[in-house]
Amino acid sequence: MFDPVKRADMLRPLMLKNGKFLISRIAGTGEEVKEDEDRIAYSTYFKFKWYIDLPEQLSLSPAELWSPNLLGLVDNPLSSSLRDIKKLEFQNPPFSAAFRMKGKHGDPKDYNRAFTIQLSGCNYNCNYCFVPPETNACNPNFSKYFSVKEIVDYFLKAREDFNEPINVVRVTGGENMIVPEFVIELYNELEKIDGTYLWIDTNLSATKHMENVENELKDVLKRRNVGVTGCFKGTCKEDFSLITGAQQSFFDDQFKAAKLFLDWKTDLYVYLPALVYGNSVEQKIDGFVNMLQALNKNLPLRVEMLIIHEYPAAKRNMELKSKEKRPIPLTDQRKVFDSWYNKILPKYYSKEMLSKFCCEVPL
């Protein structure tokens, strides 16, 4: 098992060079495959993601979309398909963007299509990752350096080329906070464009580099048109290490990073892959909820659990990591969802709190 902090230090000079940032190539990697109508490349290096894509949801009015009836799991989740287990697969970023920009009068469909920028370089080696390993490794054959201005020009061209609204720019990876200067520079460019919302993914591992630009980064992260999602890799240190390949001792660093975001008044959300090893699913989830509550009593209500699909790259990663004795758990993901939404959260929160969208939950 490796040290992700040292790995980040090695990757940083490759991810940022001469004022330009290393962006992953999408074309030819399998990520442009339009399997679920939600992944398609706009160009060689940039792609879109749709979050609300069911016809019956796209036809709803804004008021209907904000109904708590869309939250949680379907009835009888353990007998449903994994793909259909959640009533609304993703709340974020469309709901969080609409709420932050316009309150519950905002239409999530206006923030449904995200122009996605994928930085190359990750200090984890997750066994379920949706990104091909070569794309995450700063490989010059699968990446290219861009200035922030060049990237924003692509975004503006995409806005011209499509009829539906494109108001979200999503920064993913790789791990963005290894080069937090990218977030700062990108926001400064997007600030000139009215109505734009910036969504930032992070694996909560790079506080060292965040703190190096604390003043500028903190100023960006507290803005109303910025949201951050921190992806926790597992509910305990043992599972964290199996998932990421990192040493168990770095499990706690995720909570330190989340606390830093909260201290900086960031609009923070949490992703949690539905991957739990062994038979103690409820016990592990209960312990994880308590760890989040130690940071903020309402933070578990801002968790969006992720379904792990076997996308082409994910399937490759699963096969590779299985050979390294790090297979994804055999535990049925539906059981993890059921434990989180139907058994553990109701122990700690009222029906009123459970009926709120993540973005409505105060921190």
Task: Tell me the role of every PLM-derived stretch.
Residues 127-130, 138-142, 181-183, 210-212:
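Short, conserved acidic/polar surface loops in the N-terminal third of protein domains
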